[in-house]
């Protein structure tokens, strides 16, 4: 007879969070599982894992994006460009388990992973990354 716990899934036990791979030229502590794009007007979806202490430098993306925090805690700082370089734009934003964050296309931001994070990341159309240092 199956136990009730045999029917339960969490982000620790679900196959959804397996088969992640490292990607060259990305921060240490980052792994991802991606989908296969089949629609040029579709969305790029990634299941991301970030180790606590990992940071992404200021960057932007060509499309709007949405991040859903499945597990963990992270922060985002927005920036604007000035003649002196990048200047923080507003206060740092924190996203916790269960939170959803949206970032407009082209908006410069960083990301810091305060705790181990599992994220569902959705990018409008094909994903792109532009370093803004």
Sequence positions of predicted segments:
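A short, N-terminal "cap"/entry segment at the start of jelly-roll beta-barrel domains
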Residues: 1-47, 92-93
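Conserved short histidine dyad/triad with adjacent acidic residue
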Residues: 44-61
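A cytosolic small-molecule/anion-sensing beta-strand core signal
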Residues: 47, 70-71, 115
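Short beta-strand segments in beta-sandwich/barrel cores
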Residues: 55-57, 72-78, 100, 127
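Glycine- and acidic-residue-biased ligand/ion/polar-headgroup-sensing regions
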Residues: 62-83
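Short acidic-glycine-tyrosine-enriched beta hairpin
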Residues: 81-105
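Ligand-binding loop in jelly-roll beta-barrel domains
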Residues: 97, 102-130
């Amino acid at each position: 007879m199956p136990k009730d716990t045999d029917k339960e899934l969490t982000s620790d036990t679900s196959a959804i969070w397996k088969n992640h791979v490292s990607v060259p030229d990305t921060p240490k502590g980052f792994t991802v599982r991606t989908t296969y794009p089949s629609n040029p007007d579709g969305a790029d979806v990634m299941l991301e894992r970030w180790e606590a202490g990992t940071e992404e430098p200021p960057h932007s993306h060509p499309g709007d994006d949405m991040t859903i925090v499945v597990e963990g805690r992270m922060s985002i700082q927005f920036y604007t460009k000035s003649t002196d370089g990048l200047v923080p734009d507003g206060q740092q934003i924190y996203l916790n388990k269960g939170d959803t964050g949206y970032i407009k296309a082209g908006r410069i931001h960083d990301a810091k992973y305060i705790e181990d994070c599992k994220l569902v990341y959705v990018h409008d159309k094909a994903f792109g990354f532009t370093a803004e240092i």
